């Protein structure tokens, strides 16, 4: 019988059946195609292209003319397609019906690969051919001959994708054809030259539309898809994504308008809409039965190719570049070198990681599948080889295995067929469109042999285990030579035999039932929330333990035991810094911690400097955002806890020592208290003890009779005992008497010192008439004693102290003129001057002082002299040492309180209300003048503004700390000077006071206070100077910011005081509340008149 054409056969077949029903394989009559299928499977015949109306009875020889590529490209505009869920577009890879080659001989490169640049067809045996680089990129893959069978596409135990392509010429497909797979069959455009005349026959009625579509014998099935999306970073020459999308949409519209009316009849209900069609899928049948898919939709971006694939948490097997030194460079048509293409390999299935073997394991009987992503930048035309730049004939994908210990030894790869047979895997010819990503998936692969030394030893991996590496290489052919473009090799792989009893399951090896009931044994490391544990148990997150953590501590398991120095542990703990912190969000999400939880702890880098053995490196840590922390440090808090134990022990030792010392101090305190009580009792009985000691000392000493040599004088037996006791009692009595004597002498000495202080001190109290007061007036180099007698005409220079070893110098003066003490202010400008006496009035009432402030407000303050003057009734000679002669006790001033102190406080802010202790100074100390700044300079922390020197211009005398009323009134922001005025000075007048400072200050007059008034003569002028402001007794002339000249008006009173305040520059007055009181210094100048 004549063999019908495929199109005609299919058309007649579907016209005779109801396609609305279920077209099951059992319901299809395939008797019409039996003869055709049986003859087509022969590999020794070739079928030429014939029109659809021509039939032939015998196959044609291989020498028949084949398809010419030029004819296909010249008529590409007449493309026709059916609505099968996909459309053609610009640059789409189109299928070409293979035709016979010039000869049936094998190609020069592999035995089954024909790469001829001038031939656009596949050999009859169905091996891949090389694509011409001229014109539109075209993929053409033939169908390999298979014997008829009834096996399904995939083995039942395989999860791989269907191996057999959905072709019309596939006998198995014809038996299992359904309307669903028919809808996906698109007749590719056949734009060829007319067949030879002897093969032409009558055209069918619709031949006007079918003339370019010859028989579909040996056709390839291709599902058309949308154009692959562009890479994000393919280079500047790549068109933008929006322009590419616009071109794709335009070409889609053109192809839809060019569809021919005469198409295969398909039921409308079985048509798939364009929106329902699967996108991003391109299936091509290769010569050895592998599936080549182009699914760029699975590629997210360029970062996913480079970054996420290197993530250590990636689930699949890892790949690394292989033989990079042998990679060649590609060039475009203008001989410009193209950028390196993007090449990524991914193992979809077939490899499982074995924790016990620490490697990926592949069972030889199971399939493994590999997907390759190739991103081509530009259109390659040439390749640079050691022989020079050669034109590219084709690209192909090659898979093979190599041994890890010898990578030059290749392991062949096999591929399963539909009938479960295995054939060697041959390279896959590829067409790489420019500026696009091509996805190629090859499935049903097996290693041809297994690795060596796979047998386990005692349930553990064999130490002599051998490994394979799977190499996926992209190669290019030029002038019958192959060159490596890119290649990647996998991690080490163990390939095991198919006998499951030969190996134990990984689950059984890792997790086993323990020896005790309800126990499980695991061999290896465990990671919770992490896939790469570096310890026996690694937990990323919090751990909750309701019990206790136990640690080994048996002495029998320890050696080199040494006790630590707790002192060093305390020092290390004191150096550690405790901080509050939050973990970074990217780190917390990686290790399973709460991002907002606040933690308290230490810093590993700081602990590493103090306690290095408590810090350990745990390798690099990759966070969720891709950031890598190199040599991540962890802290052993158990080690720090033991440091705390040692530090606490050291603190306990220190506490015990302190308690011991406190107990000793308490015992000594009790003993001292008892001694004080005994001293007080002895001081009361010191007189009695002295008299007894005197009487005991007056008893005559009884000499013992001399001893006669060689003769013993007998005596009473009890006499020696009595004498021994008497001697002991005498010694004890002498010791007690001596102690009493020392205590009595000390007490008397202290009492005498106090009496002398009262006798020699003058504090400004009233002196009764007829008495003399001994007063010492100091000079810098001389101290002269004077006796001030009230109501007596005796001169000062005639009263001398009796018993002085050095009499005072004699001073000769006129009867009407008497020299005042050296520090007395004498305003007598034209001596001799008249005596102006302002006598002290004896009264029981305290003097009344009227204080004048800068606001002209007056208040009356009642003050009582703190200590009465001492009246010397008898002039008793007394020898005084130099220190005693150099002492001076000046009357205590009645100083007004500063305005910022409390009215009840009678002392300076830094002084205590205690009795002034008489301080001793030597003549050498007195010889050095002390300025008001001597005390403030001693305190470097004092920030007060003060003066450096005070000088009276009338007498050209410096006012120093010797003029202080007491040592406690000069310092800490308060200086009170007591200045005597001679009786020869008038009641009115002025004093010029020069104030100097080391830095600019502001000097303000605060207030004036005066005591009892004197009987002012009528001739005395007004005390106020007309040049001074009204209402004040002072006027100031500022010479410079550091020098001030004040004019003080004398007041007709027994004593009067001027109050000046030194403040920071810019102070408005004494009542300026914006000035800090700790920065001001108050100066009180108290003048009192000498009457007698």
From Swiss-Prot:
GO molecular function: DNA-binding transcription factor activity; peptidase activity; sequence-specific DNA binding
Annotated positions for site Cleavage: 552-553
Protein name as annotated: Myelin regulatory factor
E.C. number: 3.4.-.-
List of glycosylated residues: 941, 961, 974, 996
Record's compositionally biased regions (Pro residues): 196-205
Record-annotated DNA-binding residue ranges: 246-507
One BP annotation, GO: central nervous system myelin maintenance
Stretches with biased composition (Polar residues): 681-695, 849-867, 928-945
Cytoplasmic side: 1-730
Region of interest (Disordered), residue spans: 145-168, 187-210, 258-282, 681-714, 798-817, 849-945
Coiled coil: 646-677
Gene name per UniProt: myrf
């Amino acid at each position: 019988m004549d063999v019908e054409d495929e199109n005609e056969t299919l058309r007649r077949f579907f016209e005779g059946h109801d396609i609305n029903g279920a077209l099951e394989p059992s319901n299809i009559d395939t008797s019409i195609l039996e003869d055709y299928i049986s003859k087509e499977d022969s590999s020794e015949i070739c079928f030429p292209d014939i029109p659809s109306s021509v039939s032939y009875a015998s196959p044609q020889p291989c020498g028949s003319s084949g398809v010419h590529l030029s004819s296909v490209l010249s008529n590409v505009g007449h493309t026709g397609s059916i609505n099968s869920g996909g459309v053609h577009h610009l640059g789409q890879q189109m299928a070409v019906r293979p035709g016979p080659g010039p000869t049936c001989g094998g190609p020069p490169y592999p035995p089954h690969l024909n790469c001829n640049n001038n031939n656009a067809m596949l050999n009859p045996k169905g091996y891949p051919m090389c694509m011409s680089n001229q014109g539109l990129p075209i993929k053409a893959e033939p169908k390999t001959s298979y014997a008829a069978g009834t096996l399904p596409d995939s083995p039942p135990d395989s999860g791989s994708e269907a191996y057999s392509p959905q072709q019309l010429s596939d006998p198995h497909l014809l038996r299992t054809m359904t309307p669903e797979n028919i809808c996906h069959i698109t007749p590719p455009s056949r734009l060829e030259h007319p067949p030879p005349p002897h093969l032409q026959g009558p055209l069918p009625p619709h031949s006007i539309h079918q003339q370019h579509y010859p028989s579909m014998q040996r056709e390839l099935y291709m599902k058309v898809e949308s154009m692959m999306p562009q890479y994000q970073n393919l280079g500047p020459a790549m068109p933008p994504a929006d322009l590419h999308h616009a071109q794709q949409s335009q070409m889609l519209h053109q192809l839809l308008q060019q569809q021919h009316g005469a198409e295969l009849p398909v039921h409308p209900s079985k048509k798939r809409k364009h929106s329902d069609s699967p996108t991003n899928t391109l299936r091509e049948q290769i010569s050895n039965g592998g599936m080549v898919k182009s699914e760029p939709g699975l590629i997210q971006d360029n970062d996913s190719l480079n970054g996420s694939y290197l993530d250590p948490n990636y689930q699949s097997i890892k790949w690394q570049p292989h033989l990079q030194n042998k990679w060649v460079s590609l060039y475009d048509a203008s001989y410009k070198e193209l950028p390196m293409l993007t090449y990524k390999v991914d193992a979809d299935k077939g490899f499982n990681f074995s924790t016990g073997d620490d490697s990926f394991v592949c069972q030889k009987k199971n399939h493994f599948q590999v997907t390759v992503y190739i991103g081509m930048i530009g259109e390659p035309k040439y390749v640079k080889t050691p022989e020079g730049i050669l034109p590219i004939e084709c690209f192909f994908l090659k898979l093979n295995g190599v041994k890890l210990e010898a990578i030059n030894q290749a392991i062949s790869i096999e591929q399963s067929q539909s009938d479960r047979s295995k054939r060697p895997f041959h390279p896959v010819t590829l067409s790489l469109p420019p500026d696009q990503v091509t996805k190629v998936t090859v499935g049903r692969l097996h290693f041809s042999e297994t690795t060596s030394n796979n047998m386990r030893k005692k349930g553990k991996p064999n130490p002599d285990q051998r490994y394979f590496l799977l190499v996926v290489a992209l190669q290019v052919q030029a002038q019958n030579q192959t060159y490596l473009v890119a290649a990647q090799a996998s991690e080490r792989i163990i390939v095991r035999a198919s006998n499951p009893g030969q190996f134990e399951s990984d689950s059984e090896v890792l997790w086993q039932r323990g020896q005790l009931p309800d126990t499980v044994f695991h061999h290896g490391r465990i990671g919770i929330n992490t896939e790469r544990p570096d310890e026996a148990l690694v937990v990323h997150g919090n751990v909750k333990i309701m019990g206790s953590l136990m640690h080994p501590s048996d002495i029998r398991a320890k050696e080199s035991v040494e006790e630590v120095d707790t002192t060093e542990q305390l020092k290390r703990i004191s150096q550690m810094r405790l901080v509050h912190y939050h973990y970074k969000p990217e780190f917390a999400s990686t290790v399973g911690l709460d991002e907002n939880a606040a933690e308290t702890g230490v810093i590993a880098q700081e602990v590493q400097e103090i306690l290095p053995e408590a810090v350990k490196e745990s390798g690099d840590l990759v966070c969720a955002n891709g950031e890598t922390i190199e040599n991540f440090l962890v802290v052993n808090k158990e080690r720090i806890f033991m440091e705390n134990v040692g530090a606490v022990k050291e603190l306990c030792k220190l506490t015990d020592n302190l308690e011991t010392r406190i107990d000793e101090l308490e015992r000594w305190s009790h003993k001292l208290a008892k001694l004080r009580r005994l001293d007080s009792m002895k001081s009361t009985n010191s007189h009695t003890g002295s008299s007894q000691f005197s009487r005991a000392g007056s008893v005559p000493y009884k000499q013992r009779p001399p001893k006669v040599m060689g003769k013993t004088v007998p005596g009473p037996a009890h006499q020696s005992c009595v004498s021994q006791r008497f001697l002991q009692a005498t010694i004890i009595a002498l010791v007690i008497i001596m102690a009493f004597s020392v205590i009595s002498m000390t007490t008397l000495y202290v009492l005498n010192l106090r009496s002398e202080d009262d006798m020699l001190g003058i504090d400004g109290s009233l002196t009764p008439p007829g008495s003399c007061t001994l007063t010492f007036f100091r000079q810098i180099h001389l101290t002269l004693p004077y006796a001030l007698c009230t109501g007596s005409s005796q001169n000062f220079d005639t009263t001398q102290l009796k018993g002085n070893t050095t009499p005072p110098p004699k001073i000769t003066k006129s009867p009407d003129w008497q020299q005042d003490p050296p520090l007395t202010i004498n305003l007598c400008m034209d001596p001799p001057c008249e005596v102006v006496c302002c006598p002290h009035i004896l009264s029981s009432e305290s003097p009344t002082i009227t204080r004048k402030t800068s606001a002209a407000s007056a208040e009356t303050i009642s003050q009582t002299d703190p200590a009465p003057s001492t009246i010397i009734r008898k002039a008793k000679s007394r020898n005084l040492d130099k220190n005693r002669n150099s002492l001076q006790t000046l009357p205590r001033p009645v100083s007004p309180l500063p305005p910022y102190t409390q009215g009840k406080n009678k002392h300076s802010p830094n002084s205590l209300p205690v009795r002034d202790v008489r301080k001793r100074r030597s003549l050498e100390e007195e010889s050095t003048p002390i300025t008001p700044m001597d005390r403030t300079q001693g305190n470097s922390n004092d920030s007060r503004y003060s003066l450096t020197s005070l000088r009276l211009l009338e007498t050209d005398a410096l006012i120093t700390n010797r003029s202080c009323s007491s040592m406690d009134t000069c310092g800490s922001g308060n200086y009170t000077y007591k200045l005597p005025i001679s009786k020869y000075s008038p009641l009115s007048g002025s004093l010029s006071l020069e104030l100097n400072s080391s830095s600019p200050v502001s000097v303000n007059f605060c207030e004036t206070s005066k005591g009892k008034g004197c009987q002012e003569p009528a001739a005395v002028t007004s005390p106020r100077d007309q040049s001074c402001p009204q209402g004040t007794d002072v006027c100031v002339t500022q010479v410079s910011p550091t020098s001030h000249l004040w004019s003080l008006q004398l007041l007709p009173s027994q004593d009067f005081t001027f109050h000046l305040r030194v403040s920071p520059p810019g102070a408005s007055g004494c009542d300026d509340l914006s000035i800090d009181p700790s920065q001001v210094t108050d100066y009180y100048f108290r003048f009192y008149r000498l009457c007698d």
